[in-house]
Amino acid sequence: MDFLRIEGGKTLNGSVPISGAKNAALPLIASTILSKQSVQIDNLPDVQDIKTLLRLLQNLGASYQYEDGLATIDASKLTSTVATYDIVRTMRASILVLGPILAKYGRCEVSLPGGCAIGQRPIDLHLQALEQMGAKITIKAGYVVAEAPNGLKGSTIIFDKITVTGTENIVMAAALAKGTTTIINAAKEPEVVQLCEVLKDAGVQIDGIGSDELIIEGTDREPIEMRAIHVIPDRIEAGTYLCAGAITNSTLSIENVIPHHLDSVLVKLKQMGFPLDVNESNITIHPARTIEPVEIVTSEYPGFPTDMQAQFMALALLANGASIIEERLFENRFMHVSELKRFGANIQLKGNIATVIGPTELWGADVMATDLRASSALVLAGLAAKGTTNVHRIYHLDRGYEKLEEKLNALGANIQRLSE
């Protein structure tokens, strides 16, 4: 198993290109099931989750070619509607095939999903919504079995709480349903917006894109004509590299970004004292004279993203005073706290609120990644620490960050990927 060895204390310099967004790419790949012909998707990040979903589609009878961030996928005629445990267990996003397969073929079986161990992330909201659209759903031997032999019917779906993958699943299901589906309390994330825009470009009538109420006119099981897709840049990767610049007190630029997707992150960096230059597709961060403590509450987009919480906790270790971080979306997303303490961090936990007491002198340590974003926080702490840090179980990192150590080394970091 691989681990990363980081020699800390290096100043970073230069610019880093931001990859396509994994969380946008996954629903876009799933949406090719709705297409009547092959679909090209470019700017795909070279990360494990993308390869896993492509392999899942191949298992279902799709064909694809994938090289240098460009995939050509033909999922127009699947030969199976069963997404098996051996692939689904490694990735939660596998559930995204449920909506499109059920809508198109009238039946789908998906093994209950795996992925990061950060809280329950129940798929009940997906299943209840599909039942409202006429599906019969049972759980058998660890599989969700969904049946709608006469197709799905448009309905009014009110999500009890905002769900990104739930919104995406129902948008795809509604695209091929009969009649009008209204989704109330829909997620507004840029990744959801891109999926809706791609489907609209393919002829599906969708109103309210970018709002919390989506109205979708279904095609009554008529496959759609999808065009080439360019995946939006990864706002979480972008935020992580901005934190890498901040935590090493460096001047660093990120390229190929959509700055307004990062508004909530940029506000917090400015509050902490980091000067920012923002233009159309680039952001440059400069060193802070003093790093100020910050208060962060995670929430759905356009609020502060839960996927940036761990990275800001690492950064807050260097702030002059106490920072307060409240996690409102997941109940088990502070697993990185015990690992950050191995660097010397002073963090007090009470329920879903972490108080980070700074400034802390960080020392290199052996640490273990617990989930995707927590692992990037450990890398950030390692960059700032004195001495050598070894980050173990980095398969979490490889699920979501493309060439992380290569990109950081190009900026002046000293990181090696080694085998245990």
From Swiss-Prot:
Keyword vocabulary terms for this entry: Cell cycle, Cell division, Cell shape, Cell wall biogenesis/degradation, Cytoplasm, Peptidoglycan synthesis, Pyruvate, Transferase
Q: Where is the signal peptide?
A: none
Q: Which domain of life is it from?
A: Bacteria
Q: Which residues of the sequence carry a binding annotation for UDP-N-acetyl-alpha-D-glucosamine? A: 92, 121-125, 307, 329
The compartments listed are:
Cytoplasm
Per the Swiss-Prot or TrEMBL record, the active site comprises 116
Top enzyme class of this protein?
A: transferase
Primary subcellular site in the record, as a coarse category: cytoplasm
Cross-referenced SUPFAM superfamilies, in alphabetical order? EPT/RTPC-like (SSF55205)
Tell me the residue numbers annotated for binding phosphoenolpyruvate. Answer: 22-23
Enzyme Commission code: 2.5.1.7
2-(S-cysteinyl)pyruvic acid O-phosphothioketal sites (modified residues): 116
Which biological process, per GO, is one annotated for this protein? peptidoglycan biosynthetic process
Catalytically driven reaction(s):
phosphoenolpyruvate + UDP-N-acetyl-alpha-D-glucosamine = UDP-N-acetyl-3-O-(1-carboxyvinyl)-alpha-D-glucosamine + phosphate
- GO CC term (a single one): cytoplasm
Q: GO molecular-function annotation terms?
A: UDP-N-acetylglucosamine 1-carboxyvinyltransferase activity
Recorded metabolic or biological pathway in which this protein acts: Cell wall biogenesis; peptidoglycan biosynthesis
Q: Which InterPro entries match?
A: Enolpyruvate_Tfrase_dom (IPR001986), Enolpyruvate_Tfrase_sf (IPR036968), MurA_subfamily (IPR050068), RNA3'P_cycl/enolpyr_Trfase_a/b (IPR013792), UDP_GlcNAc_COvinyl_MurA (IPR005750)
- PANTHER family, alphabetically? UDP-N-ACETYLGLUCOSAMINE 1-CARBOXYVINYLTRANSFERASE
Which family, according to UniProt?
A: Belongs to the EPSP synthase family. MurA subfamily.
What is this protein for, i.e. what is its function?
Answer: Cell wall formation. Adds enolpyruvyl to UDP-N-acetylglucosamine.
Q: What is this protein called?
A: UDP-N-acetylglucosamine 1-carboxyvinyltransferase
Which species does this protein come from? Answer: Nitratiruptor sp. (strain SB155-2)
